[in-house]
Amino acid sequence: MQDERVVLEAGPDGLPVLFERPRELVTASTPAGAQLALARLEQARAAGFWIAGYAAYELGFALEPALADLWQPGAPLLHFGVFDAPRPVDASAEEGSALVTGVTPLWSRARYAESFHAVKEMIAAGDLYQVNLTMPVEVSFEGSPEALWSALRAYQPVGHGGFARLGEEVILSRSPELFFRLGADRRIEVAPMKGTAPRGATPAEDDALRDALGQDEKNRAENVMIVDLMRNDLSRLARPGSVKVPELLKVERYATVHQMISRVVAELDAAPTLPGLLQALFPCGSITGAPKIAAMRAIHTLERWRRGVYCGSLGWAAPDGRAEFNVAIRTLNVTAPGRALMGVGGGIVHDSTCDAEYEEALWKARFVTGLMTA
């Protein structure tokens, strides 16, 4: 297991760390296997080891009994390593050269419109309030996965990126979004990201686009819906009265887009287990919609593709109870030499328009398409 490793940019002290030479790999491809795997990971953590790896979006079907019928056989639901303590790593180190040679949405605009209008009908019928509709995108590249991750990292610095090579899969994540951060004192923070606008060509245009996003009623409503969902998810574990929203509707700049973010914090009622945390919170509401179970059913019906690690989570957990996981957006799964699959999309609400949502989805691929000319 010499090649297996996980690099996470948001390590235990907020700095990049490397997990290498795992003592054990823990994976599962069925709901029953996932429950056993999570129990094994918790056992390893209790024995003084660290765990690091990733969970696929579809793990949510194994964790929520109301969604159990959606599971279909396929790729792993989770893949983690059991490690000794991580070591600091220079995440900016060069890994060779890489070039993106193609970025191809696997849905046509008409295919997207078909699912978009179906979501709008569900919203009009009162079945749900928001659905995070995504579509698959194929990426072709030259160079190693490590070199591609290095190039992506240089092009779009983010706070929650990661690289994982565990078994057969290689995952490259350039996520800017925190799923949850848990301290040894049982304080937990989530930071849902909802609302996107492109960067401007000039400083003045860029400021105008940022300000417009911050004032946009649709995006503000979309973000608040997910904040409410996350507050509800946290309340399943939190001490009564401890769930707070210290930051609401903040707009942050990234290399290719502006993003609207909020922050929710809570104090957990008891020392949580990793299975308990994921049972309450996974997957993150920002990539499902609301209500969560209804939105996930709609996604399963309308998308008809396996998201995999995209919209799942990469992260680590420590023996002392600390843990941090991202929301695996802007994330690629290397499927063959020189080929990878990712997803792009966004939240659909009652006043969304098809053309605007389709274009927003394409903006979110700029962290990759930018390397075609870099």
Residue spans for each PLM region:
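Extended alpha-helical targeting/anchoring segments
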Residues: M1-A374
